[in-house]
């Protein structure tokens, strides 16, 4: 298990709707804990495969 993630390595992450991009620290998971980051957003992806509209993610601006 990734110490930065509540899920088992390779499994889907689960995160509350209030999750912020900066809290997305999963490195061993295939899916993101956060849905506010677009794919390829290096600032908040931090190893996660983030998805969503970039206009919903102020840390990517």
Curated annotation (Swiss-Prot):
Binding site for a divalent metal cation 6: 37, 41, 44, 60
Binding site for a divalent metal cation 7: 50, 57, 59-60
GO molecular function term, any single one: zinc ion binding
InterPro entries, alphabetized: Metalthion_dom_sf (IPR017854), Metalthion_dom_sf_vert (IPR023587), Metalthion_vert (IPR000006), Metalthion_vert_metal_BS (IPR018064)
GO biological process: cellular response to cadmium ion; cellular response to copper ion; cellular response to zinc ion; detoxification of copper ion; intracellular zinc ion homeostasis; negative regulation of growth
Gene3D superfamilies from the UniProt entry: Metallothionein Isoform II
Binding locations of a divalent metal cation 2: 7, 13, 15, 26
Region called Alpha, residue ranges: 30-61
Family designation: Belongs to the metallothionein superfamily. Type 1 family.
Name of the protein this chain belongs to: Metallothionein-2
Species for this entry: Macaca fascicularis
Gene name per UniProt: MT2
């Amino acid at each position: 298990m990734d110490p930065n993630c509540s899920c088992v390595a390779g499994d889907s992450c689960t995160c509350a709707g209030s999750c912020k991009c900066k809290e997305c620290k999963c490195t061993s998971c295939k899916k993101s804990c956060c849905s506010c980051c677009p794919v390829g957003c290096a600032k908040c992806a931090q190893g996660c495969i983030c998805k969503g509209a970039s206009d919903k993610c102020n840390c990517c601006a």
